[in-house]
């Protein structure tokens, strides 16, 4: 069974919600430091960890993550370094790892080659924000062949479109809380709860909400409408402050989910 499924089964048994921090690799932390951080985050309540693969033109991301990617690339971070980070994590932990990666990175590595290395490294899921539904078929098949879940991103759209995007999804559905890029927001857009309820009608796997989840207060606001929360920019911003700042923030978020 995929580690993502095992983790959601566990949080369900414990009657709690999943906490999914997003981290970057090679910007403020070295590969080794990133791996150590992720192992520590699991101990502090992280259910799954999402790792962003640096890219020069991350259109779905806001300035905090864009700047982290730029710094990582300037530091010489490559795709192979992200895979090495996952391998280091696997030496110490079975926490599920999901890569957030733009398709150009996958394409230039070679789709089959990328997925093969990802599986060998210990990756459990893939989020590819710039691949539309109509072009997902081949990638979905190669992911399946490598026992990696292709996690769908679902934005606020028509009921028919939501149904099409989530059809056959595995692992969890990534619900985008707001139209636009990633980034911290003090409150969520109006209609978020209704949107999540519409997604819920179409899926029988966990739903997690991301984009704009920035504080314990926002976590408390949405936790009753989803199965987990994904926190990105607020984590990456604290990575620039050091490991303890990230750990303390994740502890606080975890408390908000109880």
Swiss-Prot record:
A GO term, aspect molecular function: tryptophan synthase activity
Matching InterPro entries: Aldolase_TIM, RibuloseP-bd_barrel, Trp_synthase_suA
Keywords in alphabetical order: Amino-acid biosynthesis, Aromatic amino acid biosynthesis, Lyase, Tryptophan biosynthesis
Catalysed transformations (reactions): (1S,2R)-1-C-(indol-3-yl)glycerol 3-phosphate + L-serine = D-glyceraldehyde 3-phosphate + L-tryptophan + H2O
GO cellular component terms given for this protein: cytosol
Documented EC number(s): 4.2.1.20
Domain of life: Bacteria
Pfam families to which the protein is assigned, alphabetical: Trp_syntA (PF00290)
Catalytic residues as annotated in Swiss-Prot or TrEMBL: 50 (proton acceptor), 61 (proton acceptor)
UniProt xrefs under SUPFAM superfamilies: Ribulose-phoshate binding barrel
Binding partners and assembly: Tetramer of two alpha and two beta chains.
UniProt record similarity statement: Belongs to the TrpA family.
Protein name: Tryptophan synthase alpha chain
Gene: trpA
